[in-house]
């Protein structure tokens, strides 16, 4: 049996999240169907389930520019994808998947995973970014599927004061959907808001010599970046929504601090729309630390 590491990206707008669900288009379901096709394994073959384990289970409408999954597959089945090609089996599988997957999923690479690697439990940290266009932003319509537009002027200083309260080990019960048997305790390493500088006008080099704006799709956007060891369900979107309420003046900084101090879930700190959120990066330790990391992270965290 071989464990493969799969690095991929996807536009989440057309999916009901990562996790496979009956009769719904999901990222996991789409890739697993493609694997069954290219490896010629029946979908009901219990001996070869071809089931993916993922680093971050994204929700409906959430994107990923860097996602990681692992797959356990027998050597006999894996070798089927080589066919007449004289290339490594991982490259052959990458090519065949790219040929059958839809354009909103991209496989960046497949490799044999190091010993002890677990896509979910070996991860050191995950980075999410949420993009917002407020009244001061220049909205590029090409980004409408991955940016949330709000008709408000946002105070980034207040929003950063709120975000700073999340850094460290906390119970994020006010900002997460309860998970029976799980915990909402997480360690946030970085959390901050910034506005992408608006691209200056520069002379056009063409004959008209008219000023034009250099192409920067994120010019003027308000961007939230958060890094943590792991995230509870809906945690990032709920934090973003609450920070926006503070930045727009609809809620006070004291209200946000109270939600952090008293981890009780209620409607005012619920998740904001998904389309602005992207899973940007998954980081892993050195190969010789993968197994130890996976064992440690499986333990239930306490404050």
UniProtKB/Swiss-Prot annotation:
One GO term of the biological process aspect: tRNA pseudouridine synthesis
Enzymatic class: isomerase
Signal peptide: none
Enzyme Commission number, as recorded: 5.4.99.12
GO molecular function ontology, one term from the record: tRNA pseudouridine(38-40) synthase activity
Listed InterPro entries: PsdUridine_synth_cat_dom_sf, PsdUridine_synth_TruA, PsdUridine_synth_TruA_a/b_dom, PsdUridine_synth_TruA_C, TruA/RsuA/RluB/E/F_N
Annotated catalysed reactions: uridine(38/39/40) in tRNA = pseudouridine(38/39/40) in tRNA
Binding site for substrate: 128
Identification of the protein by name: tRNA pseudouridine synthase A
Organism: Bifidobacterium longum (strain NCC 2705)
Organism taxonomic ancestry: Bacteria, Bacillati, Actinomycetota, Actinomycetes, Bifidobacteriales
């Amino acid at each position: 049996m071989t464990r493969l590491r799969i690095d991929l990206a996807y536009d989440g707008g057309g999916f009901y999240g990562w996790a496979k669900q009956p009769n719904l288009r999901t990222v996991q379901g789409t890739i697993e169907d493609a694997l069954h096709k290219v490896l010629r394994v029946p979908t009901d073959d219990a001996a070869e389930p071809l089931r993916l384990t993922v680093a971050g289970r994204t929700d409906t409408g959430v994107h990923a520019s860097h996602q990681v999954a692992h797959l356990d597959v027998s050597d006999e089945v894996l070798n089927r994808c080589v066919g007449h090609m004289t290339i490594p089996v991982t490259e052959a599988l990458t090519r065949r998947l790219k040929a059958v997957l839809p354009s909103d999923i991209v496989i960046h690479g497949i490799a044999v995973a190091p010993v002890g690697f677990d896509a979910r439990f070996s991860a050191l940290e995950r980075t999410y970014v949420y993009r917002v266009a407020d009244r001061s932003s220049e909205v590029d319509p090409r980004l409408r599927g991955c940016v949330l537009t709000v008709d408000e002027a946002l105070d980034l200083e207040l929003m950063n004061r709120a975000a700073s309260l999340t850094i460290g080990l906390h119970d994020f019960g006010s900002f997460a959907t309860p998970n029976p048997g799980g915990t909402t305790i997480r360690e946030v390493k970085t959390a901050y808001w910034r506005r992408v500088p608006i691209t200056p006008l520069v002379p056009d080099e063409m004959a008209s010599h008219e000023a034009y704006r250099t192409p920067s799709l994120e010019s003027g956007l308000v961007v939230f970046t958060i890094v943590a060891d792991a995230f509870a369900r809906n945690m990032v979107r709920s934090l973003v929504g609450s920070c926006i309420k503070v930045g727009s003046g609809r809620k006070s900084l004291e209200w946000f601090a109270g939600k952090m101090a008293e981890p009780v879930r209620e409607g005012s700190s619920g998740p904001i729309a998904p389309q602005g959120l992207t899973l940007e990066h998954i980081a892993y330790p050195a190969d010789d630390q993968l197994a130890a990391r996976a064992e440690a992270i499986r333990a239930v965290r306490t404050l």
